[in-house]
Amino acid sequence: IVGSVCSTSYLHFTSSHSNELYVYNWGEYIDESVIDEFEAETGIHVTYDLFETNEEMYPVIEAGAVSYDAVCPSDYMIQKMVENGLLAEINFENVPNIANIDPVYLEKSKAFDPENRYSVPYTWGTVGIIYNVQKLEELGVPAPTKWSDLWDERLKGEILMQDSVRDAFMVALKELGYSMN
């Protein structure tokens, strides 16, 4: 009934293939029709691989079996990947649309990519609570208004959460009165 939603990803590019683009992204972030349109317009074939968590993505990139042109890790993972030599600097001459990104997001990105050399903000989101009003009414539980509401005993066994260690820790930290950061 209750879940957390988080969506913050960054696009990282390299250019190692001429008529083929290898992309590694979160599941359900780009509709297949967009890829089809891109291929039709450019003549470039897209190999589009999916991952569900940063922790699933990281060892694949680290192993180097596939040389991806674009990888879409979350903010904290970019810093780890840069520190471990897994991301190349982006040639921004090949990314003219960076001019269309709100400077607010580029500034926020400096927290993990201080000179914005390795990433481009691609999506931005928040962590929140989604709930089924009807199910809560059946359980006699009021709609949650704060993270601590998730510890209501009547919700035991009824909560679903996105598979994200970082989000789970954030919820627990908030419950204990700490900053989510």
Language-model regions, residue ranges each:
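Hydrophobic membrane-insertion alpha-helices, especially the h-region
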Residues: 1-6
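Extracytoplasmic ligand-binding site segments that recognize negatively charged/polar headgroups
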Residues: 67, 72-181
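Early extracytoplasmic/lumenal segment of secretory-pathway proteins
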Residues: 8-84
